Amino acid sequence: MDHTASLSPVRPEAQPTDDRERALRPRLLKDFLGQEKTKRNLRLFIQAARDRNESLDHLFLIGPPGLGKTTLAHITACELGVECKVTGAPALDKPKDLAGILTALSERSVFFVDEIHRLKPAIEEMLYIAMEDYELDWVIGQGPSARTVRIPLPPFTLIGATTRAGMVSSPLISRFGIVERFEFYTPEELAAIVQRSARLLDITLDARAALALARCSRGTPRVANRLLRRIRDFAQVAGSAHISETIVRAGLAHLKIDELGLELHDIQLLRVMIEHFGGGPVGAETLAISLGESPETLEDYYEPYLIQIGLMQRTPRGRMATARAYAHLGLPVPEARTLTPHSPEQGTLL
């Protein structure tokens, strides 16, 4: 599999790099569409913290890329009326990197760490006491003369986001007072997001066009917004000031994105499972090697959506293509391959 997949408009893991795309992010909870349970909880917790004039308890956000974890971290800081310091776990390479940030935080501010599962053990250990006691242990000197100095920190809120909760250590998870899990968005929720983004981008599109685009957005707002901008390009070149359902479908066909939001690399993955491994079960590492991808890319990007829409199952023995996958590819379904739509590993996104 070639790595031009990283340029695909349906790859949700890449962070927005365009100021116009960042401008689509809502700034308040009332403007954040979807994730209703998480919003209800956060609204209550934020109000309680403000009423007590305290920092919000530490918040752990779990979910696939592109669902709004970073956006919600910024919204939380905005709703609290405090600053938000943002970093990624890979940037916290040495203890002094973390110490420099923690000691510069203002009272009740938000410290957002993306990809928190990638923290080094030494950095995690520093965070334990910082999160629990708002203090920082710092070692001065070396060898027998070394001593530990405890530095007081202002009360703050750590917001950690991850796509791989299983890689976060139990001691770190236990220090988060609030844990929220993000779910894929429904087509109706995504259609509302597309219509909001269209208004902000001064794009005219009808409800049917918004829903058609939403159905191909992998349950992910970041993908929906990216596709909206690409479809706008098609409409502009076609000389149309209005985006219709016909233009959406023509644009998606040109981008090689099918009605389920699958691109060529998704189709190739399913075909490799079926044609090379008899539909599975096949291990993640073996499948990743066959595709020329890393196991992490397979698990973080491809699997969640394919499992959610019922094209793949993850079992103790490995990954399996479902009967629905065979049908989607127009292949005969083996008699032994039965579809279990109510399996806990599968969802009902579409």
Curated annotation (Swiss-Prot):
ATP binds at residues 24-25, 66, 69-71, 132-134, 175, 185, 222. The keyword Nucleotide-binding applies. Belongs to the RuvB family. DNA binds at residues 314, 319. It catalyses: ATP + H2O = ADP + phosphate + H(+). SMART domains: AAA. Transmembrane segments: none annotated. Its EC number is 3.6.4.-. Its main location: cytoplasm. Mg(2+) binds at residue 70. Residues 186-256 are annotated as: Small ATPAse domain (RuvB-S). GO terms for cellular component: cytoplasm; Holliday junction resolvase complex. Has 3 domains, the large (RuvB-L) and small ATPase (RuvB-S) domains and the C-terminal head (RuvB-H) domain. The head domain binds DNA, while the ATPase domains jointly bind ATP, ADP or are empty depending on the state of the subunit in the translocation cycle. During a single DNA translocation step the structure of each domain remains the same, but their relative positions change. Pfam families: AAA_lid_4, RuvB_C, RuvB_N. Keywords: ATP-binding, Cytoplasm, DNA damage, DNA recombination, DNA repair, DNA-binding, Hydrolase, Nucleotide-binding. GO terms for biological process: DNA recombination; DNA repair. It comes from Treponema pallidum (strain Nichols). SUPFAM superfamilies: P-loop containing nucleoside triphosphate hydrolases, Winged helix' DNA-binding domain. It is an enzyme of class 3 (hydrolase). This is Holliday junction branch migration complex subunit RuvB. GO terms for molecular function: ATP binding; ATP hydrolysis activity; four-way junction DNA binding; four-way junction helicase activity. The RuvA-RuvB-RuvC complex processes Holliday junction (HJ) DNA during genetic recombination and DNA repair, while the RuvA-RuvB complex plays an important role in the rescue of blocked DNA replication forks via replication fork reversal (RFR). RuvA specifically binds to HJ cruciform DNA, conferring on it an open structure. The RuvB hexamer acts as an ATP-dependent pump, pulling dsDNA into and through the RuvAB complex. RuvB forms 2 homohexamers on either side of HJ DNA bound by 1 or 2 RuvA tetramers; 4 subunits per hexamer contact DNA at a time. It is found in: Cytoplasm.
